[in-house]
Structure formats: structure tokens, C-alpha cells
Amino acid sequence: EDTSNTVFTIRSDGLELIDGRFKYQNQNVDLNSLNQIDFNHLDISRISGSFSDVEVIADSVTANVDDLRLREQSGFRVRQLDASIVVSSSGVITESLLLETNEGIINGRFAMSTDTWSSYSNFLEEVLLDADLVESTVVFNDLAFFAPQVKDLLTPLHFTGHVTGTVSNLN
């Protein structure tokens, strides 16, 4: 049987992670500063949380996430993440989002759209944000882990409303 065109698929009703770790090292690229997330050298530890209705199909992951917690080597922390989430090479979409990070809290719907995974390397210019947020607090020091240029800008920002655009050109 020819399986060369078979799409990789995993499905699970439920999954629980307790103190997991994910590490990715691109040996062809030097390590960036440790105070920002380096997508070529990820080291995510203390991963704990519950997942339901999980589907992994090709490069896409869909799941309901409950109380996900983790720490990235840069110092970025997710203190709590609850959401219905889709992650793929074209972006991340979250519904019913509650995200508590080092200093901020995001409630609502949030999406990041990209052309490819490599777009995250130029986060400010290439990642399109689209969010409907309720009673949220964005702290630019949290965003600085992805885009160091925004560190210490207008912090914190409390708001409810719709946000769209790249970080460099928010509307």
C-alpha cells in the first residue's frame, strides 16, 4: 500500500500534561538574546494543562485548552491559558480566551495570522493581529519577549475593544 500521500493525523478526546518540556534547537542559527523568545531555539518547560477534543492534522493542531501553564527560557510565562485554539503555519486563532502572562491578562478572541512559521522572526512587521478583547490588560514588557522594540512602551494598557494590524501598524 502506497502511504506517501497519507496525511499525518492524531485525535484524542482528552490529554493531560504534567510538568512537560518541549525543546527545539536549530543548529544552523545562533542563539538570540535570552530575554526574548528565539523561535530557532525554543526551550519550554513546566508545561502543565488539560486538553480536550484534540486533533493534529498535517501542520494544524486544534484543541480546547484548560489551565495550561508554561515557562520559556527567555523568562516569558503563561500563568494560565484557557481557550479553544487552532495553531497552524498560517497562524493562531483562539476563542473564549483567558490568557494570564508575566504581567498581562487577555480576555476574548485573539488571532495572529502569518504567511509562514518564519514570519514570527519578524513579529513586528509580518504577524497580523486581530483581537476582540474584554477587560484586558496588555503590558508591552510581555510583548517584548516577541518584539523587543516595544519594551517599556505605554505600560500597562487597559482596554475593551477591537484591535487589528501588525504591531508596527496597529489600528
Language-model segments: residues:
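Extracytoplasmic loops and strand-loop junctions of Gram-negative outer membrane beta-barrel proteins
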Residues: D142-F145
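Elongated, acidic membrane-bridging lipid-handling scaffolds
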Residues: D2-V127, S136-V138, L154-L157, G165
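Flexible, surface-exposed loop regions and adjacent strand-edge segments
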Residues: A147-V150
